[in-house]
């Protein structure tokens, strides 16, 4: 399945990534590369909006683990928003939720991050 696209925007010092479709090998790799580019540019606050994510396969989950680790290595903050219950349950099962902040929507995540340095 290659039904994937990625929308990007910045809100002050926060990078917002909004994937659409299936997060499988190519989609997950694009998310990982984009997050690495943001971290490499010195952006330490990243929001991933899951509102248009339909499916995440096991490779996608493992790449999210890498994104979480790299964000932690850069002393960054990673927030997930608009997660469907099934996606949240998967991330809870593999322990990723312990290392990110989950918010109902982007507005809540941006409000939280605006209070952080």
Residue ranges and their predicted role:
Residues 83, 106-107:
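Short, ordered loop/turn segments at secondary-structure junctions
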Residues 25-99:
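Amphipathic alpha-helical interaction surfaces in cytosolic regulatory modules
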Residues 109-117:
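A short, charged, amphipathic alpha-helix used as a generic interaction element across diverse proteins
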Residues 2-33, 50-52:
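STAS-typified acidic loop motif
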